[in-house]
């Protein structure tokens, strides 16, 4: 297959939770980037003809037994290498420097002083804020390397061997908290690697359509359509690639938002002229979920049931070989990789039955949410679909904490509709990354009229973010929150209290379950 771009920077995954962000930041510069496991061979890399290689961070100690390594022949390819955190320590070990446990671990913001203006720090200030996350540090750089930056706790915060185009930083430039992190990555891509920045979403569409046609051939594809941004973009992209070889199946599992089922059918069946089959499986899903309160178990049940329903319905259709899903990079990250810890399993990733008979097509699994929106716009999908609020595959099933009942679902459905209506009225719907209501598994005492009540509490979650990997709670004006709270308490039965979640990610995730 033709390579997507003549210039590419490959990121090797050593297990850090933010590794895919590095790939994302490089793409933002107009340079195509892919993430590959640290086990990739030098020969495989050579065939890819990368302009540069980045070694990611990771949770291990470079000197520990069994710590992930890379093919040592990678250092002989003559390709520029940037080591980030663990990646720099690995490079240090390889070239004979010394890595040891830090006396004082550094987690969070720190100030570094630049002592050597290598190409990586070209045009950047001497003092700058970076995001540290390390328990080890470099005690002695390898021969040929110069210390570029330091601080009192980290004598080698950055280093370089410019003769061989090797660079390393002991902080995370890919995280927004690093003040000039984007500039460093830009310097690496352009000043060090010599990239020109000619990659775009149009290139991505061309590549994915080619991949889809090559993978599918003359066979049929069944698309899991939910009406959310991800599955909508997948459906339109695949339909653009193979036309009537695509059949969309929309399962109403009883865990959808208010009015969502009707909206999906109108948008895709009528608006895009796609073949959409609607399946009413509400009773089946709720029956399986009865009495289940553990969030992981709920996710697994919903994920499995989705596939089983698809298989049953697909068996009624002719020759369905492929299943398309809207899995994103963030789904894969949070479900864990070979070297990263699992945060939560995603129904698109961890909930699939082992005996599934479909071959998967996941054209968005290298994209972040904001990239998916850009892709949707590029494909001509209307704004009301592209900017629809993100909705998890398990639906309201993970916004009802604890056991799911019809009553609880109705509370979340109605309160969420009020929240979305008022956020849009206030003109905040494009400013806030994601907003929804959740129902904690708790009741509290209240007074309505002259009577004592003992009813549910509704939680409001609203966050600002760029890519969903990190987020901050949205500063919604108090008067808007007051209107939302008043309406929910007055209009939604069995609710007497509304609370606002002001936790960032991390430490919390965006969804409550």
UniProtKB/Swiss-Prot annotation:
Its UniProt pathway annotation is: Purine metabolism; GMP biosynthesis; GMP from XMP (L-Gln route): step 1/1
- Transmembrane segment boundaries: none
Per its UniProt record, what CDD domains does this chain match? GATase1_GMP_Synthase (cd01742), GMP_synthase_C (cd01997)
Report the GO terms under cellular component: cytosol
Q: Which Pfam families match?
A: GATase, GMP_synt_C, NAD_synthase
Q: Which reaction does it catalyse?
A: XMP + L-glutamine + ATP + H2O = GMP + L-glutamate + AMP + diphosphate + 2 H(+)
Instruction: Tell whether Ribosomal protein is among the UniProt keywords.
Output: no
Q: Which UniProt keywords apply?
A: ATP-binding, Glutamine amidotransferase, GMP biosynthesis, Ligase, Nucleotide-binding, Purine biosynthesis
Q: Which GO terms describe its molecular function?
A: ATP binding; GMP synthase activity
Q: Does the keyword ATP-binding apply?
A: yes
Q: Which residues bind ATP?
A: 226-232
Q: How does it assemble?
A: Homodimer.
Q: Which HAMAP family match?
A: GMP_synthase (MF_00344)
Q: What is this protein called?
A: Putative GMP synthase [glutamine-hydrolyzing]
């Amino acid at each position: 297959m033709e390579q997507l771009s003549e210039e590419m920077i490959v990121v090797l995954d050593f297990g850090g939770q933010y590794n895919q962000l590095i790939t994302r930041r490089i793409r933002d510069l107009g340079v195509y980037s892919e993430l590959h496991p640290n086990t990739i061979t030098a020969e495989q890399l050579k065939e890819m003809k990368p302009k540069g290689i980045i070694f990611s961070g990771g949770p291990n100690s470079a000197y520990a037994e069994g710590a992930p390594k890379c093919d040592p022949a990678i250092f002989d390819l003559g390709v520029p290498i940037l080591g980030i955190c663990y990646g720099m320590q690995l490079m240090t070990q390889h070239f004979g420097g010394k890595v040891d446990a830090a006396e004082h671990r550094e987690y969070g913001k720190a100030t570094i002083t630049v002592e050597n203006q290598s190409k990586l720090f070209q045009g950047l200030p001497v003092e700058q804020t970076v995001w540290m996350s390390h328990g080890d540090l470099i005690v002695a750089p390898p021969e040929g390397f110069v210390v570029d930056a330091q601080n009192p706790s980290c004598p080698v915060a950055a280093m370089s061997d410019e003769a061989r185009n090797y660079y390393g930083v002991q902080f995370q430039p890919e995280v927004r908290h690093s003040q000039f992190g984007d500039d460093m990555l830009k310097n690496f891509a352009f000043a060090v690697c010599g990239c020109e920045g000619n990659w775009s979403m149009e290139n991505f569409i061309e590549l994915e359509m080619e991949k889809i046609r090559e993978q599918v051939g003359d066979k049929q594809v069944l698309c899991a359509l939910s009406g959310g941004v991800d599955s909508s973009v997948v459906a339109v992209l695949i339909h653009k690639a193979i036309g009537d070889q695509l059949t969309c199946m929309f399962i109403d599992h009883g865990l959808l938002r208010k009015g969502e089922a009707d909206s999906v059918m109108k948008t895709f069946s009528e608006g895009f002229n796609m073949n959409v089959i609607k399946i009413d499986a509400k009773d089946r899903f709720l029956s399986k979920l009865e009495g289940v309160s553990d969030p992981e178990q709920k996710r697994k049940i919903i994920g499995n049931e989705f596939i089983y329903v698809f298989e049953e319905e697909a068996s009624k259709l002719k020759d369905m070989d492929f299943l398309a899903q809207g899995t994103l990079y963030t789904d894969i990250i949070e479900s864990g990789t070979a070297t990263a810890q699992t945060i939560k399993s995603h129904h698109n990733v961890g909930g699939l039955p082992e005996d599934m008979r479909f071959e998967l097509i996941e054209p968005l699994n290298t994209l972040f949410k904001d990239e998916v929106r850009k892709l949707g716009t590029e494909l001509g999908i209307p704004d009301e679909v592209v900017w629809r609020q993100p909705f998890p595959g398990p639906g309201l099933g993970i916004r009802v904490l604890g056991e799911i009942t019809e009553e609880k679902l109705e509370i979340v459905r109605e309160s969420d509709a009020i929240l979305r209506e008022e956020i849009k009225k206030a003109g905040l719907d494009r400013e806030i990354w994601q907003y929804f209501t959740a129902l904690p598994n708790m009741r509290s005492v209240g007074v309505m009229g002259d009577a004592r009540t003992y009813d549910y509490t509704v939680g409001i979650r609203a966050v600002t973010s760029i890519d969903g990997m990190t987020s901050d709670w949205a500063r919604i004006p108090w008067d808007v929150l007051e209107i939302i709270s008043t309406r929910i308490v007055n209009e939604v039965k069995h609710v007497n209290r509304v609370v606002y979640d002001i936790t960032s990610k991390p430490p919390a995730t965006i969804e409550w379950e």
